[in-house]
Amino acid sequence: MKIQNHRLIADDGKPVSYVETPNKSGVMTPEFLIMHYTAGSSAEGSVAWMCNPAAKAAAHLVIGRDGSLTQLAAFNRVAWHAGKSVWAGRSGLNGFSIGIELDNAGKLERSGNRWISAVSKRAYPDDDVMMANHKNDRSGTPPIGWHEYSEVQLEAATQVGLLLMKKYSLKDVLGHEDIAPGRKTDPGPAFPMASFRARLLGRADDTMEHYITLSLIHI
């Protein structure tokens, strides 16, 4: 895989699926990579929503749970993924960042013997859920359910992230939760940010993080 003319090109030399979003604006020079979850029920549904002008939001890339890639905007164009955001004294990260959305339901609520997405109302099995606190939670906040990411999805995100870091000499990898704390919680505690960031920044500690899962605590 490579990046050519700010588009992702697959190993067979063909561009990855490209569906252009209207929710973008002018040219920019990216400095950061921002990770998100879609909070939707499918990658296809999230792509369709981000291509709807009514959404007024879109990332540059959506990664499905099967590792599939759909690009919505060239990597040198402003995509409206960050919203009101601040990092290191600078605001409006749409203007200097690339956004990746991973198909993931995010927060889940327990309803009887099922886990339900508050957004899509879709149910998820225990095997796809982890219990955790968000890093921005107040002390004493009880843990809640979070939708797990798939291994192939995380590997696809890593490979794309490595390409983006090299191509654009990006300074850092951040979560939406870092640049809009209190307003956003993605990509959330199910995303292994420490190891992901270490791999992309070329640091020694790239081991996967471990979390309490439902199977371990017998919920």
Where are these regions (language model features)?
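Conserved small/polar residues in nucleotide/adenosyl-binding loops
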Residues: 217-219
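Active-site-adjacent loop/helix surface patches within enzyme catalytic domains
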Residues: 2-171
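Aromatic- and acidic-residue-enriched segments that line the glycan-binding/catalytic groove
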Residues: 117-120, 185-199
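Histidine-centered divalent-metal-coordination microenvironment in nucleic-acid enzymes
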Residues: 97-101, 180, 188-192
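Extracytoplasmic and endomembrane cell-envelope/extracellular-matrix remodeling and assembly machinery
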Residues: 195-211
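Acidic/histidine-rich, metal-coordinating catalytic segments
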Residues: 168-183
